[in-house]
Amino acid sequence: MTHDYIKRVSARQVYTIRHIMGIEATVETECGIKAKAVCNAGISVGSHEVSFLYDNDEKWNGRGVTKAAESANTIINDVLRGMDVTRQSDIDYTMLKLKNVASNAVAAVSAAVLKAGALSLDVPLYQHIGG
């Protein structure tokens, strides 16, 4: 098995199919793989759900997520660059230890890393998840 490492993490605000703003994260690897994932808030927010970072400005009734996307573009990108894309647990643990990072950005990046890891190993996503 060859190793593939994270080259770049980027994120942007997108308008989702549920008619709310979400974060689309893209993970690029050294071997040229690109994987994307979108995270948006649920219809109802339960007590065990992560709290999302919203812009709280006039645009999108305060529900924009450009600040959250920026935390992925800066903090998360800097920390994950060079990590083995197939080491999902290590990557998630690293992101969970970060301070001042939006949970919605972490969720989107984690899902994009998961997809990139499966592509890197050339296995179906379900197989990568299940080991």
Predicted regions and their residues:
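Short, Gly/Pro- and small/polar-rich lid/capping loops
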Residues: M1-G22
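N-terminal glycine-rich phosphate/pyrophosphate-binding loops that anchor nucleotide-derived ligands
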Residues: E24-T26, L125-G131
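Metal- or metallocofactor-binding catalytic centers and their adjacent structured scaffolds
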Residues: I43-V123, Q127
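A generic structural signal for short, solvent-exposed coil/turn residues
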Residues: H3, I17, T29-C31, G117
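Short beta-strand elements
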Residues: I23-C31, A35-A41
